[in-house]
Amino acid sequence: MKTLRNIMFAGTGSDVGKSVIAAAFCRIFRKDGYAPAPFKAQNMALNSFATIDNLEIGRAQAVQAEAAGIPCHTDMNPILLKPQSDHTSQVVLNGKPIGNQDAYTYFRGQGKDYLRREACEAFDRLAAHYNPIVLEGAGSISELNLRDRDIVNMPMAHHADAAVVLVGDIDRGGIFASLYGSMMLQTPKDKNRIKGIIINKFRGDLHLFDEGRQMIEHLCGVPVLGVVPYLHDIGIEQEDSVVTEKMHGRLMNDKVNIAVVRLRHMSNFTDFDALDINPRLNVFYTTDKQMLAQADMIIIPGSKSTIDDMLFLRETGLDQ
């Protein structure tokens, strides 16, 4: 079977569904007889996955590798940033921690060129064994202040010679502005690499959006390749976004209520996935004393900054 061009799923913002769509295409390409592999140059997430060599990568790439039917490897996510505080992250390179850096040093420091080379070399190693490579971007592709230091979105798409598909989330509103704005803020070179749009998380009757689809194509100058319905309980880990969905959880009378204390530097909340998928349980994250008092069970999760979170519990009275 002939080879395919590499493909990147970039986003109008964070949590628009890039990880899930990339996983879906890994499985589609696999079923079509190709040998795909996922790749994300740089990830920022508290949660990591241990490879067979006991090295760390982002959990999304581990899920995507499973969808592709291959073992996960650090080349799929060579740079992983694990937040330690509001301003500092642990830098994991090729699966191994190499130290902590504050945001300014990371984005402005001399080491950025070194990390860029490492990311490109990891991609090249992966591409030597798999085709196509299914790349995932990070956040928005339109962060103008970070463009010259970006190593995960359009610069990586150029290195991979990947066709870029822009993913937008219609469920959060503002789909026209987010898609059009993202396209218009691209340089001519970058804009030319974007070949189509996927509209994600659509609710309702698709036929009612036919006119909107045509408007987007006219405004953006590229085809809308598909509209993906809003999917419930798909069970695919999406980095840290699952917590944001449960930050405003509530007590349920017909279920066992499990309250997870929402620490400032909570780590590995995927530890609670086994509880979360049980229909008899209601898992939610909170710092509300009244909700904690009414819960059937309280869990204090792991922390990336134990002392700071212990002080937080004492200062807020949650330790009582």
Model regions: which residues?
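Flexible phosphate-sensing "switch/lid" loops adjacent to ATP/NTP-binding sites
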Residues: 1-319
